[in-house]
């Protein structure tokens, strides 16, 4: 599916009706938000991009209740705020359950997320599972914890989603996450694959949704800073993601600096695949391709 140019463009034109809906106040959690024109423009851009992703990938199809993963980072806080705002406007007909999985990392501030989620009035669940000890035991010295830690977290979130009667797990991955994953697979895995905006889990009973797929990380960072979310650092365990992802992030930043707009172009390319111009015979029947007699 080809991504609409408008879905990624800051100057997207929207209908007068939708503009009126976005201008009609905001969820109470935005009560202390900046009143500047620039922030209002940023907020509406992110709301439009989330709505576009919901529509493009049919994320609302069959959905009744979502488990929203909240780690305490800028991305998941922003995702939850935008979803709550859309729901408040009557544009998101699903129930939201925010969930944080405390994985037993050292110095994790246990009060921050419960206090914040309680203050904004969202149904939430905080669960403690000491996966950190498992990761420390299994991962060789000097290696990063992130991959195994992520897999253990995902498995627990699936379980919690089922226990909460949710039909989808909603995560805060954004445009840069998707592009970095694509190039990691491209350079290191020898395959064309990325992080899909919508995925059915292996068991076939839960969807994994990424409504921030079109949103730029820089926009999310500005939004989170303006909203003054109580950010919890992601390096409490002392382990950071490997050099591969950092290298991809640096490469993409350099390309965007030298050729502004290339990240959006790359993202559109992921939705405009021409199988006959690639080399995978499983995607295109090259064997039967021959000139007319």
Curated annotation (Swiss-Prot):
The keyword Kinase does not apply. One of its GO terms (molecular function) is sulfurtransferase activity. Pathway: tRNA modification. Binds 1 [4Fe-4S] cluster per subunit. The cluster is chelated by three Cys residues, the fourth Fe has a free coordination site that may bind a sulfur atom transferred from the persulfide of IscS. Its cofactor is Mg(2+); [4Fe-4S] cluster. One of its GO terms (cellular component) is cytoplasm. It catalyses: cytidine(32) in tRNA + S-sulfanyl-L-cysteinyl-[cysteine desulfurase] + AH2 + ATP = 2-thiocytidine(32) in tRNA + L-cysteinyl-[cysteine desulfurase] + A + AMP + diphosphate + H(+). It is found in: Cytoplasm. It comes from the Bacteria. Its main location: cytoplasm. One of its GO terms (biological process) is tRNA thio-modification. A motif (PP-loop motif) lies at residues 71-76. Keywords: 4Fe-4S, ATP-binding, Cytoplasm, Iron, Iron-sulfur, Magnesium, Metal-binding, Nucleotide-binding, RNA-binding, Transferase, tRNA processing, tRNA-binding. Transmembrane segments: none annotated. Its EC number is 2.8.1.-. SUPFAM superfamilies: Adenine nucleotide alpha hydrolases-like. Gene3D superfamilies: HUPs (3.40.50.620). Pfam families: ATP_bind_3 (PF01171). [4Fe-4S] cluster binds at residues 146, 149, 237. Catalyzes the ATP-dependent 2-thiolation of cytidine in position 32 of tRNA, to form 2-thiocytidine (s(2)C32). The sulfur atoms are provided by the cysteine/cysteine desulfurase (IscS) system. HAMAP family: TtcA. The thiolation reaction likely consists of two steps: a first activation step by ATP to form an adenylated intermediate of the target base of tRNA, and a second nucleophilic substitution step of the sulfur (S) atom supplied by the hydrosulfide attached to the Fe-S cluster. Belongs to the TtcA family. Homodimer. This is tRNA-cytidine(32) 2-sulfurtransferase. It comes from Sinorhizobium medicae (strain WSM419). The lineage of its organism: Bacteria, Pseudomonadati, Pseudomonadota, Alphaproteobacteria, Hyphomicrobiales. The gene is ttcA.
């Amino acid at each position: 599916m080809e991504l609409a140019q408008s879905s990624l463009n800051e100057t997207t034109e929207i209908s007068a009706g939708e503009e009126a809906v976005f201008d009609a106040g905001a969820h109470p959690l935005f009560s202390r938000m900046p009143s500047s024109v620039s922030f209002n423009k940023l907020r509406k851009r992110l709301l439009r991009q989330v709505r576009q992703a919901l529509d493009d990938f049919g994320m609302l199809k069959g959905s009744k209740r979502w488990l929203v993963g909240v780690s305490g980072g800028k991305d998941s806080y922003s995702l939850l705020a935008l979803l709550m705002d859309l729901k408040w406007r009557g544009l998101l007909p699903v129930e939201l359950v925010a969930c944080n999985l405390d994985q037993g990392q050292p110095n994790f501030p246990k009060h921050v997320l419960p206090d914040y989620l309680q203050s904004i009035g969202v149904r939430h669940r905080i669960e403690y599972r000491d996966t950190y000890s498992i990761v420390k035991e299994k991962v060789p010295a000097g290696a990063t914890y992130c991959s195994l830690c992520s897999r253990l977290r995902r498995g627990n979130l699936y379980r919690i989603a089922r226990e909460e009667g949710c039909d989808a797990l909603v995560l805060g991955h954004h445009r840069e996450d998707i592009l970095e994953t694509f190039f990691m697979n491209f350079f290191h895995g020898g395959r064309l694959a990325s992080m899909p905006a919508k995925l059915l889990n292996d068991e076939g009973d839960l969807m994994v949704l990424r409504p921030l797929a079109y949103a730029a990380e820089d926009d999310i960072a500005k939004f989170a800073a303006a909203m003054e979310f109580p950010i919890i650092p992601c390096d409490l365990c002392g382990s950071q993601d490997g050099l591969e992802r950092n290298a991809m992030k640096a490469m993409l930043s350099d390309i965007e600096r030298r050729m502004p707009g290339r990240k959006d172009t790359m993202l559109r390319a992921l939705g405009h695949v021409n199988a006959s111009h690639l080399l995978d015979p499983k995607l295109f029947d090259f064997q039967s391709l021959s000139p007319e007699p």
